[in-house]
From Swiss-Prot:
This is Small ribosomal subunit protein bS20. The keyword Magnesium does not apply. Binds directly to 16S ribosomal RNA. Keywords: Ribonucleoprotein, Ribosomal protein, RNA-binding, rRNA-binding. It comes from Beutenbergia cavernae (strain ATCC BAA-8 / DSM 12333 / CCUG 43141 / JCM 11478 / NBRC 16432 / NCIMB 13614 / HKI 0122). Belongs to the bacterial ribosomal protein bS20 family. One of its GO terms (cellular component) is cytosol. PANTHER family: 30S RIBOSOMAL PROTEIN S20, SMALL RIBOSOMAL SUBUNIT PROTEIN BS20C. Disulfide bonds: none annotated.
Length: 86
């Protein structure tokens, strides 16, 4: 445990950010999973709708600093490729 007051505050702040990022990443995984499930089911309309939502969530995560922009681009590209393959 830190002894310096500013470091104690940073530990608290970092923990809050970690919890926030964890929740956001969990939400991202849920939306990506919905796209993949729609693709495996062969439902093109649902898959394209889910892809649109997932892409929006990925972009939002980038703007909030939760994930890197290249990671979001790679995920969106892979999902779009799967959906277009239907």
């Amino acid at each position: 445990m830190a002894n310096i007051k500013s470091q104690i505050k940073r530990i608290r702040t970092n923990e809050k950010a970690r919890q926030r990022n964890k929740a956001y990443k969990s939400e991202l995984k849920t939306h990506v999973r919905k796209v993949r499930e729609a693709v495996t089911a062969g439902d093109k309309e649902t898959a394209s709708d889910a892809l649109q939502v997932a892409s929006r969530k990925l972009d939002k995560a980038v703007s909030k600093g939760v994930i890197h922009k290249n990671q979001a681009a790679n995920r969106k590209s892979a999902l779009a490729k799967q959906v277009s393959g239907l």
